[in-house]
Amino acid sequence: SRRQRQMCIRDRDQTSKLSKRNGDASFEDIVAKGYLPEAVVNFIALLGWAPKGEEEIFSLEELVENFDISGISKSPAIFDPVKLKAVNAAHIRRMTPEVFLEHVTPYIRQTVKRQDIDLPLLASVLQPRTELFNDVPEMVDFIDKLPEYDITMYCHKKMKTNEETSLKALKAVLPVLEKLEDWNTESIHKALFGLIAELEVKNGWLLWPVRTAVSGKQFTPGGGVELCDILGKEDALARIRRGIEKLS
C-alpha cells in the first residue's frame, strides 16, 4: 500500500500556516521574483526532510536519488526566506559560467544598454556575488552612466580613507593607469598593486577610492580592478578624473 505524508508549513514567526488566502507566495510567485525553480524545489524539500549527510544543495536528479521518506520530520516546517535566498545563491554558484551567462544576461540588459561591455567578463564578476537574479539590474546600473554621489562615500573607517587621502590616491592612480597599453584585469591589478607597494600603503587605502570613483556606489559587484576592466579604459579614466574634480 502507498503511504502519504502531509507537511504543515509555518511562516518564520511560527504562529500561522502559510496560506494563499493570506497572501502568501505560491511557487510561481517565488520564481517570478528571480529564484531558480530547482532552488525553490530544493528548499521546499528541505522544509520537512533531513538529508542523511551534510550536503543540502541538490539538483532535481540528486533529490530523486537521495530522498528517503525516513528523513521526513513530523514537526511543522518553518518557511525561512533567508534560507531560501541562501539555497538559491548556492544553486547559482553551481552553474557553469555559460549557463549563468545565459540566465543573467536579460537582467543585465534591463539597465546596461552599452554594446561595448564584455558580458562574459561581467557575468564572471557577478556569479559569486549574486543571490537573486532580480537584484542584478540595480547591481550594474552604474555601468551605462556614473550616478551622482556624495564625496562622503570616500570615507571608510576600515579602509582608513577620507576625502583627503582619497584625492591623493586617485591622483597617484591616474597617471599609472593612463600609461597602460594593455587594458585587462591582470594588467590593471599589476599596475595598482605595484603602486600600492611603491607608496607603502594598505590595499584598501588605494582601491576603495578607485572603486568609489568608477562606480559611485557603496556596494558593487566586484572591486576597483574588475570594474575598471569592465568599464573600459576611456570610461574608467574619465570617472577617476571626475572623482578628482569632486574631491578637489
Predicted regions span which residues?
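Acidic/histidine-enriched alpha-helical segments
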Residues: 56-63, 188
